[in-house]
């Protein structure tokens, strides 16, 4: 642990916590700090100008990252008949109805995301206490309850990420891996920011995107100058 601590301290010394870094410099620093033996994730934290305690200011949604997430995703789908076949053809690993519900109740959850056709919610609704705490409960707001299950599966496989503001008004999301090229990370970040802008509550006043910071799994936070995000 001491070795990791010393490395983290060395990286922290390179980063000015008060400075706003141009996006290119921020990505360069974050990638440099990602020196663990595994391919660290590159994460973003976005402080929003909303009151997270108000139900009409809860920011939630999903976005397909153009460069993907660098993670292989296993998808489970609640569907029947033709929609079940479409889900399988789109690449879903697990497709079912009551049988899938029983697997979940038995603790067999070898998947990363759950998608449901609207007509299956009578079954899915009984799984709220199991799927909810794990962040797996299908929801129309993030596109996981939809009649077009095939597209939902394809989006999940293509690098879709879900986001939801926490109690502190912050959005946390992964935009790729340390092995990604800076251009890929930047395009993913831009896609996320665009999605957040579209999800801005009508009742939100003042500055909406207050702070943006990047970090790797084992690295330190680097603040981003938002003005440089718009520059091409």
Curated annotation (Swiss-Prot):
Gene3D superfamilies noted in UniProt: 3.30.190.20, 3.40.50.790
Alphabetical UniProt keywords: Repressor, Ribonucleoprotein, Ribosomal protein, RNA-binding, rRNA-binding, Translation regulation, tRNA-binding
A Gene Ontology term for the protein's cellular component: cytosolic large ribosomal subunit
Pfam families: Ribosomal_L1
UniProt GO BP: regulation of translation; translation
Molecular-function annotations in GO: rRNA binding; structural constituent of ribosome; tRNA binding
Quaternary context: Part of the 50S ribosomal subunit.
Primary role: Binds directly to 23S rRNA. The L1 stalk is quite mobile in the ribosome, and is involved in E site tRNA release.
Homology family: Belongs to the universal ribosomal protein uL1 family.
Name the UniProt record assigns to this protein: Large ribosomal subunit protein uL1
Organism: Burkholderia cenocepacia (strain ATCC BAA-245 / DSM 16553 / LMG 16656 / NCTC 13227 / J2315 / CF5610)
Encoding gene per record: rplA
């Amino acid at each position: 642990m001491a070795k990791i601590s010393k490395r983290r301290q060395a990286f922290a010394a390179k980063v000015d916590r008060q400075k706003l870094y141009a996006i290119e410099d921020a990505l360069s620093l974050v990638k440099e700090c990602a020196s663990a033996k595994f391919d660290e994730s590159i994460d973003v934290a976005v402080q929003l100008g909303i009151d997270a305690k108000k139900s009409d200011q809860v920011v939630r949604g999903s976005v397909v990252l153009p460069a993907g997430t660098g993670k292989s995703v296993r998808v489970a789908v609640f569907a029947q008949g033709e929609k079940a076949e479409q889900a399988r053809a789109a690449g879903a690993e697990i497709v079912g109805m009551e049988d899938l519900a029983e697997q979940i109740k038995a603790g067999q959850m070898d998947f990363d995301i759950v998608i449901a056709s609207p007509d299956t919610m009578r079954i899915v609704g009984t799984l709220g206490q199991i799927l909810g705490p794990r962040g797996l409960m299908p929801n129309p707001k993030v596109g996981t309850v939809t009649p077009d299950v095939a597209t939902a599966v394809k989006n999940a496989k293509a690098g879709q990420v879900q986001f939801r503001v926490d109690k502190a008004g912050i959005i946390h999301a992964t935009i790729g891996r340390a092995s990604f090229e800076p251009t890929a990370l930047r395009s993913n970040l831009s896609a996320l920011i665009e999605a957040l802008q579209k999800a801005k509550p009508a009742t939100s006043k003042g500055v909406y995107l207050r702070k943006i910071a990047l970090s790797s799994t084992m690295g330190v936070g680097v603040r981003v100058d938002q003005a440089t995000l718009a520059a091409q």
